[in-house]
Amino acid sequence: MRELSPVPPDALAVEAIDLRKEFVRKDKKRGKRRVPALADVSITLERGECVAILGQNGSGKSTLVRLLSTLLLPDGGSARVFGYDVVKDGKAVRRLVNRVSVEASFFKKMSPSENLHYAARFYGMTVSETKDEIPRILERVGFPPDRRTEPMENLSRGMQQKVALARALLTSPVLLLLDEPTTGLDPRSKLEVQEFIREMRSLHDSTILLCTHDLDEAEALADRVGILDRGHLLALETADELKARYEADTLEQAFFAATGRGFEDEEDELDAEERKVLA
């Protein structure tokens, strides 16, 4: 069986306090400059809660996910996952977390089944445990049987995203970090992913942080919705509370009132910088 870190009964699922992260950007005119990705962000998630973070590309959503999953170190502040510090207790945190992102990481020459078997071994699962479980989970996420032995590099983004979701379901994470999980998916696959998120909550009691710019998705799935803009968390309330606060009829109107910008104005600058740092 997968070896989980002990979960303290009274610990918050996520507790981030004044979390800061900056990246260094090279500019031909101004030379090097520091660009804030997160600026004193504080956020808590209760166990079993689903919280959606809305933000444009470059708002800091991916940075927040990477910090909580120990892929990045914060420049300031602190973050704990079920009581474990993401810096000091990284190994314990990783045993409790699974991250599904738009740029899901796989061994590209290996097949979906091979990637899932590798993930299972990484999490301490035995061959006997995964022999029947992996085909069942691939079927659950709608992955066609005749594509399961193809190299990942031959698969579309949507297909790869389904494998990422299968990996998350296989390892039954206590905290599921979803970074744009439905980006690039067709409408049917998108609905399947949303049903998967509901299943993770109902069957596995997972806590979920959903980073997205799909307003309907956030409102349908999340208990609370946060608005993140240029590294600043402007609000974190229920969808109805956000609409009431900004005197808006829709979540989109509330987002525009909070940020002064719509999603059509989004830029990809900081996300590109993050990818450069992580490369």
Feature roles, as predicted:
Residues 172:
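Conserved catalytic motifs of ABC-family nucleotide-binding domains
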Residues 98, 117, 121, 129-147:
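Conserved ABC ATPase "signature" region
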Residues 176-179:
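Catalytic Walker B motif of ABC-type/P-loop ATPase nucleotide-binding domains
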Residues 191-204:
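Helical segment within the ABC ATPase nucleotide-binding domain
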Residues 236-237:
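ABC ATPase "signature
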